[in-house]
Amino acid sequence: MPDEFPSFEQTPKLMERWISEFATLSPKDRAEALLCYAKAHISFVSIHPFFDGNGRMARLLANFPLLRNGFPPIIIQRSARREYIDLLSAFQKMQTSPFPELADCQAFTAFLETQWSETWEIINAAHGTQAARRKMSGVEGPAPAKQDN
């Protein structure tokens, strides 16, 4: 991570901008959803508004545009934590602004794609388990979510 985050004097203005940009995130497809998550997450962590918990808060908040538009959340697996931290650190070392350009998000977005694929596997396994239970009990339920929303 960088040696220095924005000063506490800069944080309110940066967070105002973050909130303004965050409010406009409305992904229409999988690629946009990944990019929205990446931009929201990277910029929040780069602003670093709290003494502790910025990564946890970024992971939570970055999922809201996805959930709001019918996508499942991106869950970063514990086993990928080192790669996650390394990618954020690499971004922050090369950036002069906490707000990433689209091209700067490519490595993090590729990482998120892998993590989201694992999330889909968890969702599909849960749907399979539910379907099997319904079949055994004779109850019909909704069809599983489609991955290509």
Predicted features and spans:
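FIC/Doc superfamily catalytic core
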Residues: M1-N149
